[in-house]
A protein has these predicted regions:
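Copper-binding active sites and cupredoxin-like electron-transfer domains
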Residues: 1-202
Length: 202
């Protein structure tokens, strides 16, 4: 099932694709924004919880401001199949970005495409340390709706976040739901001074 604007036969709800089968989606890329697609075959929540989803980005014709871009798919892992998440993460692997911080440069625009595809829990959130972000709900408007360091999202919601770090250092990002962060949904940005990066490379 594709979120967005398209004909009914491209909605992906009634066209079940069996093992070895295929279905080709064709639609105009509209509207501008960050959109979701996922399996819509019952049991839907189990299929989504086990990874049958993705995201696609439609940029405005005039483009967006140059930025270092990344995507976060916020999800959970039900490892014992009891309908409750045992671990949480961004891009599937719990604690990954805590052990492998994302390297960025100071005073450089960062654009994060954030999708909450979490099942079995009603809401998720994103908290950024050391700076604030402008956020664009679903990215369908080019004017930000707020400036904050905390964002709460229901299931299926998407946001585009834009921010930069003024000072070098290691900065955490995580779910502000303590259970989620303690079970894997936590990471860090490693902001390096751009002049130091240049001198290190030459």
């Amino acid at each position: 099932h594709f979120h967005g604007i398209h004909k009914a036969e491209m909605d992906g709800v009634f066209e079940n694709v069996g093992p070895g089968g295929k279905f080709i989606y064709e639609f105009l890329a509209e509207p501008v924004g960050l959109h979701l697609y996922h399996c819509h075959v019952h049991p839907v929540e189990e299929h989504i919880a086990h990874g049958l989803y993705g995201a696609y980005i439609i940029d405005p014709k005039e483009g967006r401001a140059p930025a270092d871009e990344l995507i976060f798919m916020l999800n959970g892992l039900d490892t014992d199949f009891d309908g409750e998440n045992n671990f949480y993460g961004a891009n599937t692997i719990p604690f990954y970005y805590q052990h492998h911080p994302i390297e960025i440069s100071t005073n450089e625009l960062i654009r994060a495409y954030v999708v909450n595809i979490l099942e079995f829990d009603a809401v998720n959130n994103f908290h950024l340390h050391g700076t604030l972000f402008h956020h664009y709900p679903a990215g369908t408007d080019t004017v930000p709706s707020g400036y904050n360091d905390m964002l709460t999202m229901s299931q299926g919601e998407r946001e585009i976040l834009e921010f930069e770090y003024k000072y070098p250092g290691l900065y955490m990002f995580h779910a502000h739901n303590t259970e989620f962060s303690e079970k894997g949904w936590v990471g860090s940005f490693l902001a390096k001074d751009s002049e130091k990066n240049y001198s290190d490379e030459n």
